[in-house]
């Protein structure tokens, strides 16, 4: 749920800075569970995501076939494991996929094409989101502006001396 909230706030930050959000690469988002979607709806974040999406899953009208081609937009997929697990939906052969999933084994999410090796890159949620908007990896200045006001982690290293 935290990553979905980060995404919603980043979209608001980018719009505030640039006036609009335009994707230069596809961003495929699959919420972990329906319960999380319900919570995001109650908290107002789902409306933010829908505002910027070009596709929102609809259980009353499920898509018939797995998607094999993607446009440069935000896809709000059915909760669960879609592209993240390399199930039926995969990127086109030879594409470069940047994802937050650790299950990026060679050929699982993207296969090689005759012209180019398919690449799977592991990254953080903010870097993935901003990269799809920019069409490239962000500079540090762009990253800092996009995550302004977002608590990315509550982790804090121990201040105790661990080794004497």
Give residue spans per PLM region.
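Fe-S-dependent hydro-lyases/dehydratases of central metabolism
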Residues: 1-164
């Amino acid at each position: 749920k935290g990553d979905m909230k980060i995404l919603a706030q980043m979209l608001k930050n980018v719009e505030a800075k640039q006036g609009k959000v335009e994707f230069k690469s596809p961003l495929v988002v699959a919420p972990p569970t329906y319960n999380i979607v319900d919570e995001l709806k109650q908290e107002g974040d789902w409306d933010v995501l829908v505002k910027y999406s070009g596709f929102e899953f609809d259980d009353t009208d499920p898509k018939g076939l797995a998607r094999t081609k993607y446009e440069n937009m935000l896809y709000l997929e059915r909760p669960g494991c879609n592209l993240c697990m390399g199930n039926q939906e995969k990127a086109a052969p030879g594409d470069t996929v940047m994802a937050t999933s650790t299950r990026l084994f060679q050929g699982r999410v993207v296969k090689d094409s005759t012209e180019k090796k398919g690449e799977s890159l592991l990254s953080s949620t903010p870097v993935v989101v901003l990269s799809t908007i920019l069409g490239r990896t962000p500079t540090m200045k762009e990253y800092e502006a996009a995550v302004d006001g977002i608590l990315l982690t509550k982790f804090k290293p121990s201040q105790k001396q661990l080794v004497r």
